Amino acid sequence: IFLLTFIFISSLPVFSDNSAKSELFEYLIQNNTSSFLVSEKGEILLEEEFEVQKKLKPQSLMFFNLLRHGFIENRSQEDVASIQKSFVSILIGIAQQKGLLDINKSVTSYIGKWTLLTQEKENLITIRNLLTMTSGLDADFKYDAQPGSKWLYNSRVYSQLIYVLEKTSGLQINELSSQWLFNELEMKETFWKERKKGFGGFPKDS
């Protein structure tokens, strides 16, 4: 089942056979593909948006409400889920390049107290630890291991990087992302939006 937007880089020629194109689109719709794009050397050869139907497996139903946010100018609006972590890590890299932060310094030095640990233990957790999922914290921000000693996929802890970015830049995440990244990449329809109850551990989606 495809729920996210997939971009295919291909050397295939433009689909000139309408029957073949219709057959392809029907297959994509049946498999709950929301967006399909074929690109070659930076040129978009074929692009189409589809409405995802609720014919999903039980374990996928939760993602329907997470990923479907309707349409904007006939284009599907979706939460890109954990792809946003790639955006955040790039923005952290840009912030360091600008001299606004150092990934080897503690998270606390930028956003203040943020865990349930003692101040001494919390000070050991660096931005690098958050980037590499080695904070040593569990999903409730409690101690689980020494920072850097154990890998644990933890979206709630990783999301603190958004606050680090906002604190160090003096900008809200949408403004910051647009200025530093989205505008440069001509991603004119990409933005951050509040999630309901911090779904998936991130307070916002992209």
Q: Residue ranges of each PLM-predicted region?
A:
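N-terminal signal peptide c-region/cleavage motif recognized by signal peptidases
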Residues: I9-S11
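Active-site SXXK
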Residues: G42, L61-G70, S76-I103, L161-E166
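A short, well-structured edge-of-sheet supersecondary motif
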Residues: Y27-F71
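Active-site-proximal alpha-helical segments within enzyme catalytic domains
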Residues: V157-V164, K204-S206
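Solvent-exposed loop and edge beta-strand segments that line ligand/cofactor-binding
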Residues: D144-Y153, G200-S206
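Boundary at the C-terminal end of the N-terminal hydrophobic targeting segment
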Residues: V14-S16
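Active-site helix/loop module of the DD-peptidase/beta-lactamase fold
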Residues: H69, D79-S82, Q97-L137, T168-S206
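Short, basic/aromatic recognition patches
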Residues: N18-E26
